[in-house]
């Protein structure tokens, strides 16, 4: 038979728990504490947003409020000395006692914001809370580059790039309005193709194009704020005319052979030699052979001496 503890003893056993609870509540009283209804707000660019910072417990009627912005490892004041500071001046205000509202947010407002409260009359004088603000920007029309014509078996690279979206968009490619997988081997529908798509850079690479890869291509850039696409561009895959290439090479070789043969025939018939001799046989007729003109110091004029060979 179990022994029952008298009611008075049960009450005494509960007294330590009661005193601990009172002690705990006494520690909380007079300690400033903060909370937020949303620590990770997300907003579209050019909209307004409220950064929630609420005082739940404090014995100080007029605590000091400060807001700071933490971005790129730098900390700057947003609200200090009861004034909006920095790049938020003119487009932000304090709601209630501590919350911060921002109008017309831009992508540069994406950062960590720290709400700090100093209550001099409280047991715990300081408390703070950090809020991460994300400003989303819809992508603009991406720039797409698609080769117009590629021979069968050659490599081809398609590019898609967008620079305005935030967070950075992901890219997807379409051929004839059919979405392409990141790897052609992952889908039996594209078993005749060999390509790989990098959804982060927007690059679509064909290791060796086939005739089935011909078609209309376009790219879509998308993030949580929206999406945008470029205009369709056609890529044609054509067969190489091996017979025509060989025939063209043979024609060129035949023409070169005929030119060489003609030059050799002209040289053998003496066309180049006769022209050279004709040029060397030409002499100046102004001075006949066998006549010497000598001028002496005694004569003022020329004296003619001649020798004749008969």
UniProtKB/Swiss-Prot annotation:
Recorded topology in the membrane: Single-pass type I membrane protein
Lipid positions (S-palmitoyl cysteine): 264-265
Family annotation (SUPFAM superfamilies): Immunoglobulin (SSF48726)
Record note on what altering residue 219 to Y does: In HDBSCC; the mutant is retained in the endoplasmic reticulum
UniProt family annotation: Belongs to the immunoglobulin superfamily.
The keyword Metal-binding appears for this protein: no
Domain annotation Ig-like C2-type: ranges: 139-236
Limits of the Ig-like V-type domain: 35-127
Keyword set, alphabetical order: Angiogenesis, Cell adhesion, Cell junction, Cell membrane, Differentiation, Disease variant, Disulfide bond, Glycoprotein, Immunoglobulin domain, Lipoprotein, Membrane, Palmitate, Secreted, Signal, Spermatogenesis, Tight junction, Transmembrane, Transmembrane helix
Function (record text): Junctional adhesion protein that mediates heterotypic cell-cell interactions with its cognate receptor JAM2 to regulate different cellular processes. Plays a role in homing and mobilization of hematopoietic stem and progenitor cells within the bone marrow. At the surface of bone marrow stromal cells, it contributes to the retention of the hematopoietic stem and progenitor cells expressing JAM3. Plays a central role in leukocytes extravasation by facilitating transmigration through the endothelium.
Compartments, record wording: Cell membrane; Cell junction; Cell junction, Desmosome; Cell junction, Tight junction
SMART domains reported for this sequence: IG, IGc2, IGv
GO cellular component: bicellular tight junction; cell-cell contact zone; cell-cell junction; desmosome; extracellular space; filamentous actin; Golgi apparatus; microvillus
Pfam family, one: Ig_3
UniProt keyword Cell inner membrane present: no
Residue ranges annotated as Extracellular topological domain: 32-241
Sequence intervals crossing the membrane: 242-262
Positions bearing carbohydrate: 104, 192
Database matches in InterPro entries: Ig-like_dom, Ig-like_dom_sf, Ig-like_fold, Ig_sub, Ig_sub2, Ig_V-set, JAM-C
Segments in the Cytoplasmic topological domain: 263-310
Principal location listed in the UniProt entry: membrane
Domain remarks in the Swiss-Prot or TrEMBL record: The Ig-like V-type domain mediates interaction with JAM2.
Modification(s) after translation: Proteolytically cleaved from endothelial cells surface into a soluble form by ADAM10 and ADAM17; the release of soluble JAM3 is increased by pro-inflammatory factors. S-palmitoylated by ZDHHC7. S-palmitoylation promotes expression at tight junctions.
PANTHER family: JUNCTIONAL ADHESION MOLECULE C (PTHR44598:SF2)
Listed name of the protein: Junctional adhesion molecule C
Disulfide bonds: 53-115, 160-219
